[in-house]
Design a protein with these regions (language model features):
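Catalytic cores of RNA-modifying enzymes
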Residues: 1-227, 254-257, 268, 277, ...
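Active-site-proximal catalytic alpha-helix in oxidoreductases
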Residues: 230
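Short helix-coil junctions and helix-kink-helix linkers
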Residues: 241-246
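Short amphipathic alpha-helix in the helical subdomain of ABC transporter nucleotide-binding domains
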Residues: 249-252
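Mobile late-domain/C-terminal helix-loop "cap" segments
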Residues: 259, 263
Length: 290
């Protein structure tokens, strides 16, 4: 069975009386080399457990199952569960759970796997759900080694941007707090069925085992990042004054300058280390007023 062959994909879909569901962002890869490259880049440790989000008909699942000790897949579409039983039946190290990843208790689902060894994530994510799923994985506190995702190239550019670049935004800074993102390769739109309107990029995020950043108040740091980018056309002092009513614009400007920045700097110029220092200073200023 070749799950990258468009004819076999259509035969399988017809066999199970299924249609491609655009609302779920279902696009199936038809390039076997790309599939194998994604699987190879997912994790360095072949003894790992892989959490696959959105396996579809198993296009990537088989390659993961052939490379890693165990694959646990989460599939939201109930209609694809019997399809996966058919396409992945020969792989005893593969299992699928019919559940929405946004509602799933990943800690409970993968408890034995985390206790046994390393766990990484692999997913082909549609645009509309990329950020929510990524944030759930990052904020879960679970010790994933890597998160490898295939996403729209435009989104990948934002995830991998460096401070000072136009693509750099709140999600970039937040991601940099948890790990390091690297774009592995681009996948042209014509490698999918149905073909999306844009190219995709495979991004691997290596999560820190011990984070190098230590804000005094993590929630305040995230609040600072959010405020800095909600009005990105404005200077950082103006953006922060809209997000921190506890302090005056003058106080915030003084804090920005005290942290070593120009008074007219914009948020996109600050690295995650800068945001940690800035949020710590803001926190101290707020506390001093109480």
């Amino acid at each position: 069975m070749n799950l990258c062959d468009i004819r076999e994909i259509k035969q399988i879909m017809n066999m199970f009386h299924l249609n491609f569901r655009k609302e779920l962002g279902q696009n199936f890869l038809t390039d076997r080399c790309v599939v194998e490259d994604i699987a190879d880049g997912c994790c360095d440790d072949r003894r790992s457990t892989i959490l696959e989000i959105g396996p579809g008909i198993g296009t990537l699942s088989w390659a993961l199952a052939e490379r890693y000790d165990k694959v646990v897949a989460l599939e939201i579409d109930k209609g694809l569960i019997p399809v996966l039983s058919f396409t992945m039946g020969e792989y005893r190290n593969f299992s699928v759970v019919n559940e929405d990843v946004m509602k799933a208790d990943l800690g409970a689902l993968l408890a034995e796997d985390f206790a046994r060894g390393s766990v990484s994530v692999c997913a082909n994510l549609p645009y509309y759900i990329t950020t929510p799923i990524l944030m759930k994985l990052l904020e879960s506190g679970l010790p994933f080694d890597n998160i490898t995702i295939m996403i729209q190239s435009e989104v990948a550019d934002r995830l991998c941007a460096r401070a000072g670049k136009s693509e750099y935004g709140a999600i970039t800074a937040v991601l940099a707090y948890y790990g390091q993102a690297e774009a592995l390769f681009t996948v042209p739109a014509d490698r999918f069925v149905p073909a999306p309107k844009v190219n995709s990029t495979v991004v691997r995020i290596r999560l820190y085992k011990e984070r190098p950043y230590h804000p005094k108040d993590e929630a305040l740091m995230f609040r600072t990042i959010k405020a800095a980018f909600e009005q990105r056309r404005k200077t950082l002092s103006n953006a922060l004054s809209a997000g921190f009513s506890e302090l005056s614009k003058e106080q915030l400007t003084d804090i920005i300058v005290a942290c070593g920045h120009r008074a007219d700097i914009r948020g996109e110029k600050l690295s995650i280390a800068d945001f940690v220092a800035l949020s710590d200073a803001i926190g101290e200023a707020i506390q001093s007023k109480k």
